[in-house]
Each structure stands twice: as C-alpha cells, then as structure tokens.
C-alpha cells in the first residue's frame, strides 16, 4: 500500500479490478445467497446527447445515479444502471455543415470520447446494454411502432398551422417554442401551413392527467404537466350566420363555433374574433385588401399562448356579422392576432366587460362594453379594468334577462340547457394539449417509413422492409434536407403496385427517440421491440434528470408507454415510478464589453478575484493583463457564458473520487450546486486524510480479529462505537431520503471520531474503518475499494461491491452513563455524570453532593430538586 494517496493509481487499480470481474453486467432474476430472488431496482439517468464532452451537469446526474445503485446493490438488490446516447438531432447536422463531415462520423466520435470519460468516473454502468438512437437496430422500432399507430388511427397526416423555424427550416412542437423563438436556433417562429404527420396524444389526455397523482414525482413537475394538459370544463356553442363561400354554400354549415368556460357571461357578448386562418377570415379578405394584409401579418406572429398573453392585441373587422344564439342580435366578427386556429374552433366570443383581454381590445377599437355580472358593493368603470370584473365566485347575473340573479354555476347550467334545446351548444371538456406534430424537415433523424406513389398515394413501408435506413455518408450543405436530393434514398418501388415511387423525406422529431430508450436498455439485443426482460425491469424505479424535461420528454414518454400498453407490448401504465430532478450546477460569470457593447464572457479559470475580509468578491482582474473584468454574478454553467468547468481537467488534477465527493457534498441532489474551488480542494483533502489513516493504522487493522467488538471492550472502544453507530443510524436514514450531502457529512464525522479515538483498540478501529468505508463507498468507490482490499476487509466481508450494508448495532448505542446539565436556582453551574439506569432518588443524591451545589447553595440543604430525565437537574436552594 502506497504511503501517499495517488488518485490516478488508485482509480486505475479499482477500475481494472471491476473490469476483470465484468462487475456491472446485470442479469434478470439474480439470486441471493439463500437462493431467493433479489428484489430488482432500475435506476436510470436521462440519456445524454453526444455533444463531444461531458459537462459538470452530467457528472452530477450520473454520480447521483451511481451512488444510489451502488448502495442498493450492497443492500441486496439486483440493480440496473444502463447508459445510451440520444444521438439524432440538429446539432450533429450543424457540426457537419461547419466541419464538412457526415453527422454519423461526428456523432460516433463523440460517443467514443464521452464513453471513455464516463468510464474514468468509475460509474457502475452495464455497458452491455448500451443503446445509440441513431442505430438502425434501434430506430427500426420507432418506424415499426409508427406504422402500428398509423393502423390504429393514432398517427395521421394532415395540413395544419405549425410553428416554423425559418433558420433551422423545420417544424417545432409548441413545447419547443420558448418566448416565441425556436428552442435551438433562437429564431422568431412563424406560422405556416404544411402537410405533416401527427400522433394523437390528445386521445390520452384524461389518462395522462389522472395517472399523475400516484407518481412519486416532485409536485412542481406534476403541476407543470397538469397545466400543459390543461383540462377545461365549459360550453361549446354556435353563433348562427348566413355567410356563404364562393361555392354558394354556408361556411361551416352556417355556424361559428366557440368554446368558453364563462357561459354565464354570454349576454355580454359584443363581438366575436376569429383566427387569421379561419374560413370566415379568408372569405372576408377576398374583397378586402387591408384585411388580407393584416391576415398575412398575423401569420408571421408567434403561435405560443405565452406570447399571446403578453403581445399587443391587434384586430381588424371583417365587415361580417353572426347572430347571438340567445338574443338574436347581430354580433360583428373581427380577425384577432391573439386567436389560434389550432386551439378549439379558431374563434372566441368577446365579452369585454368580464375578460381582461377583451376589455383591452374593446377599449382599443371602441367596441361596446356590456356589464352582465354584478358584485355587491362594487362600481363598474368601462375605462379601467378591475379584478372583480372577472370574478365568478361572488358575482350574480344582471342585465341578462331571464338569467338575472343567478350565480356562476346556476347560470352556466341554465345557458347550456337553453343552447342545447336549440341544437346550438352543449357542455364540453376541452384540453390545452394538442396532438404532437412529429414531422421534421431534417436529415439526421428517424426516416418516416412511408412511400409516395402517384397511383396508390401514401403507402406504408412493409414490416419486412424495416428499417428504412438513413444513409450515413451525407454531408449537409445548408440548402435544405439532403435526403430530398439523394436518389439512393429517395427513389424506390411502390410496395403496392410495383411502380416507381419516392420515399418520405421528413424525419421524426428526435423526442421520439427518447420516448422508449429506457425500455430498450432492458433487452438491447431483442428481436422484437421489447420482450419478457422488459417485464422484469419495468416500470423504472427511479428516473433522474433535469427539470427542463418536465413537459417535453416526460409527457411524450408517458404517452408512448400507454400506446405500447394498448398494443399489448407492455403491462404497465406509467414508465417512471419515481423522479428526481437534480439541481443545476452554477458558477461565477465574468465579462468585458467590446466597442460595440457586446459582452465577451471570460472563463473563471482565467480570472483573479479579490475578496473582502468575509470572503465576498469585491473585484476581479484578467490574469493575462491584470486589468479589471466585470463580475456578472452566479449563473448556470453554459457555453454561452463561458463559465463551465471541464470535468476531465478536474479528474486529471484531483481524481474522479474528488469530483464525485464534491458534487455530492456541496448541495442536496434536488437543489442548485454552486461551484467552489475551495470545496473541491476540501474534498481532496478529506480523501488524503482517509488514506493516511489507513496507512498509519494499517498494520494494526490488518491484525484485528472478527467483524466487530463484543467482549473485552474498553471505555474508549465503547465511546468510539457509540459515536460511529449513532452517525451510521443517521447516514442510513439520509441514504433512504437521497440526501447524499448529509451522508458525506456523516462520513466526515466518522473519520473525525476515528482520528480522535487515541485510546481505542485495534479491533475498534478496524470495525470503525470498516463501517466508514462501506458508508462512503457508493460516493467514492475507488479509494474505498483499494483501502478495503489492502487492509484485509475482503476476507471477512467479501468484495466491497457486494459487501453487506452495515446495520446499526443498537447495543452500541446504549450508554452505561449519561451526562446531565446541573443548575442551581435555575442557573447552569456545571454537569454531573450518572448511571444511565439511575432512578430519580439516585440522581437527586448525586446532585446534592456535587461541589458546585455545595458552593452555590452555601452549604444549605436543597429545598427542592427538579429532575428532567435525560437532560438536566435543577437544585433549588
């Protein structure tokens, strides 16, 4: 055993040992020593995109997963921790465009490098289950399930208004539009009509909502999904009209349908607004150039609800009217830029008096405002909005004819009944959730397995011809989808008639790839999409990933699972029983502004920071020139802010165990972690102390006997054991709660206790260090493995990989003596030591004889002695 701790040597030794054992290869139905089946535990981190290098967020995520699975393995579980690559996507195309290489080559090179980085971290990954979503063996099942969904009517083709990213030249799902911009390119998103393929996720809306309740997920994530699914109870009804199209037929059969959750305000309708793409708007624009220009302007606006809420509300009258279904009055129809054709029927009723958006719109365009809800003691002002105008809890109807005096629910019921009696409306549940448009006009993705034939139309690729393989040697040139220009891919034969045909050149949204990869881990070599091994491992026991995936990935994966269930492929309803959303890794930011005012971000490693006496930063200078830089504050590590820490550089300098220890100790897993160089050095120092303790006491520990101290223990031995097992009890509790930061804190207390127990014997130290190594092993497996092996523990307990998890010796916690605070007349004057089983009389006698009592009571006999068991004695003199 080396005298000096060398992380590189220690980690190489441990990793070679695990590799020789093939230590992390997992099989189904593993058996315990007694022949019983081990309970399974499947813990998985969200698979990474192979961008080229790991970042500290990856390190934290995978270390959390690793700590969890290593500890559970020691507790007797059959644990699975797999890894794969979310390998399709636009970044590979962009990199290929910039570097003149095929996306496939770029992707596979990155995978190789990142896999090597993960292996250097000592992660307990079963690499025999590795999956790359760009592999034909994987994406063939994307294609296969798509065709099954097509058969069932879940997948379908239609032309609709979509989010179009003009830079990436592709369609985006609503979730991929952030603040009106493309989530990858940052370009302002436009509306566009385009034929594409959809998956009917709305068919599962109620189930997706209801099944959230029992999941062990953060409430924040559940709420985000609930809001996105967006269940609304209301009334759908029609405004009759006699507007005819060019064919002489009434548009939409003479009915303009709207949906509202406020049917109680129907008597306050003073206008209707339709989307720019609505047939009535299109018809009106034919004879109105100004309206046609306005409609074109609307089509270039955002299609996101969040943007609709904040953007300026614009409108233009069509000159057409519809009829109020209950009063018979004419209601003018406007085109509004805030109305989406993709939501509901593409039209809304306007009730300015009781809807804040309509109120602003009506005041802007001088439309009538008719109050029909009254709240006692309030006065209505048509020029200034007040919150009570939209109150449905306290108001009653007035100026509403037969409905006057009704409250919200009474009015909704009455209005719905009257509309139904006329055949013009009914109560209805609507959803914010929209079907998932999966067509992408990109190359590097799963080809949609369809063929276009002039004679037969759209024809599915026969199952025996799957996968439709993506050519991996294409290099994008920035002028559209390379697949559309590659005759090898494009030209084919129609499977129905045998005539020349062409393949579909759209590829699938890459979120398809991440919908089910975690199931493929269970049976990566399977000849079917999933098999019986998936039944063993799924549903997953613990999923780990960032909060940013709360809607996008997690909702789609849940939907995909339910489709697979309905097709008889799986037997469960939900894929992820528990979810941990780890906090982001933060770091300081620094910058200078160039002549144009643009910020040039500087990496923290290139900056010297000046601090005050309390350690707070007060200034910073660039190391290269000694000139000041601006301190930008603490933000998420990112390339854009140039404040990332290279994990490989950290591992090269300090070792993987130090990186793991710091990321676990610095913050609870679900909270943000703020980078701290001093904290990294502290983690390294702790590991050196641990190693040094093993070196100093190595001979005595190797010569110790047994697995614990039972007979012949000294007071020092008992004190050490009591302290260690007290800490172990808390550490076990913290492991159950996934509070790994306090687990690390517990191991530091254990090492402090061992170092401080100068009078403890070798057996007590041997037992104590054995406890410490096992508790610490999941966090820092390399150093603990080597110490465990070198100091002889493997002979007693076996390999640390599967050593039994330490149980608390309750007998060690029992104290023969306890210390009580001693008070005289309510003031603390010292303490007394009494037998742990001493009764009240014995405690009173000991207290009365104490020197402090004699001194402060001035020799007088006590008037009264108050004993608070286990805590204190108060002598009243």
UniProtKB/Swiss-Prot annotation:
Pfam families: Anticodon_1, tRNA-synt_1, tRNA-synt_1_2
Assigned keywords, A-Z: Aminoacyl-tRNA synthetase, ATP-binding, Cytoplasm, Ligase, Nucleotide-binding, Protein biosynthesis
Chain span(s) of sequence motif 'KMSKS' region: 636-640
GO biological-process terms attached to the record: leucyl-tRNA aminoacylation
The keyword Ligase belongs to this UniProt entry's keyword annotation: yes
Catalytic activity entry: tRNA(Leu) + L-leucine + ATP = L-leucyl-tRNA(Leu) + AMP + diphosphate
Residue positions of motif 'HIGH' region: 48-58
Classification via PROSITE patterns: AA_TRNA_LIGASE_I (PS00178)
GO cellular component: cytosol
InterPro entries per UniProt: aa-tRNA-synth_I_CS, aa-tRNA-synth_Ia, Leu-tRNA-ligase, Leu_tRNA-synth_edit, M/V/L/I-tRNA-synth_anticd-bd, Rossmann-like_a/b/a_fold, tRNAsynth_Ia_anticodon-bd, Val/Leu/Ile-tRNA-synth_edit
Molecular-function annotations in GO: aminoacyl-tRNA deacylase activity; ATP binding; leucine-tRNA ligase activity
Enzyme class: ligase
E.C. number: 6.1.1.4
Binding positions for ATP per the UniProt entry: 639
Compartmental location: Cytoplasm
Gene3D superfamilies assigned to the protein according to its UniProt record, in alphabetical order: 2.20.28.290, 3.10.20.590, HUPs, Isoleucyl-tRNA Synthetase, Domain 1, Valyl/Leucyl/Isoleucyl-tRNA synthetase, editing domain
Primary site of residence: cytoplasm
Cytoplasm as UniProt keyword: yes
Family: Belongs to the class-I aminoacyl-tRNA synthetase family.
Entry-linked PANTHER family: LEUCINE--TRNA LIGASE, MITOCHONDRIAL (PTHR43740:SF2), LEUCYL-TRNA SYNTHETASE (PTHR43740)
Name of this protein: Leucine--tRNA ligase
Lineage: Bacteria, Pseudomonadati, Pseudomonadota, Betaproteobacteria, Burkholderiales
Gene encoding the protein: leuS
